[in-house]
Structures are given as structure tokens and as C-alpha cells.
Amino acid sequence: MKIKAGFIVREVAGTFLAIATGELSKTYHGSLTLNSSAKFLFDNMQEDTTKEELVKKLVEYYDDLDEATALSAVEDFVNKLEEANLLD
């Protein structure tokens, strides 16, 4: 799974916004507000990956994060992207 192409990400007042552009903006009219962990996942989903790979990367990136919490975060983020039809 990976995020559909066509987003640009900008930092605004300490928050990251992923804004749909080009062809994607014809079907997705919103933007995604990303905290630091969501931005990390978003960046790592530009290429095809799995939930398991994302959990592993998240645990490696955040020293104090346990696998169960990382899995919950990944599943929540992926579910939101699926609901918005933003995954390839």
C-alpha cells in the first residue's frame, strides 16, 4: 500500500499540511493535518509498504514507543487514509 501521488506537504505554524494537487485534487478536495508521527508515516508511505514495515520503522524512529502503540497508530492512520480513498 502507498499514498496516492499528488500531495504537497507544507509546514504551517508547527503543523504539517498535506494538500492535494493536480489530478488528485479533482477527487479529493481536502487536506490532511499531520502531527509529527503522522508526517513520518506519510513520508514512509510514498513507496509501497506494509503495516508491519511501518510499525517497525516507527518503533525504530521513536525510542520510547512500544510495538503495540505503534501498531495502533499505524492502523488508525491507514484506516483514515482508506476511508478517504487515498491509498493505491
Predicted segments with their positions:
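Long, charge-rich, low-complexity alpha-helical segments
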Residues: 30-88
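Acidic, low-complexity/disordered tracts enriched in E/D and polar residues
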Residues: 1-46
